[in-house]
């Protein structure tokens, strides 16, 4: 299994959903970087299960225990290792269906790849529970980015076809983004909360689930971060986004809508703003040629419906090599979207840290050469 990311801001995640613990090792963190434990705990609480009626009944405190790399609230420069204990597992819920593959899950693909040796309980290492270490790493990254004036935030753009307003692609600001983080159900239009919650409740009552869309933005990102082709901002963010189990699509700026525009509509006209340059629109989501252009970086991620549903589903029993019917017991989210908001913020923070560090390394190597 490949459980690592990055060349500069390096992550390795570990653990399984029903194992003793999950966690992450962050390497490359500058010595002296601030580690605000209260801030980190607040971000972890936003993702933690059991905090909202739309979420699973499995309650986990997601309390982080830092094992190395920190002292007196600062990074020491050594690898930062954080562990989160799994304190509320019910593995018995999975004993009766170990050989029956859950549709929509990684059960069958993982069974084939790892020859049945992987831990299937709660999805094992494939579980969305492994996004908790990503939120820890993302919180550390966000603290670094805040020192550079970069703020990140996100909101629920849609659930089950009920749509929130979109970010102002030019005018979204840090105050708006910080305000969203104070809500368990972050929306730009609060009137959309009731119909969204109703859609989730209806799915739960029908022993089903629903998906949605999350829109994420970063402001304060300077122009010139990223590289063309394989080091593009879109490439790095997308790699991390698709590492989140529920994400099935991602779009930057106007995304697929750009395909229906003419160039005269899609191009972001530019003008001088004091000594700097700004764009009059932001159809490209703050990125052109794979490099940030100084506008807000904005993307949307599609979150599929939670695959664990209580209604009967057709599947196969790999032990008996026959068709079967599966009814999934256990505690599952009828909608993962509200808890995934902070996860999307975290992966954007990790990506921007990696990109900023890569840019700093390149500039350090070429200092005094390209003059």
Task: Label the predicted regions.
Residues 1-371:
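Generic N-terminal targeting/processing segments that precede catalytic cores or assembly contacts
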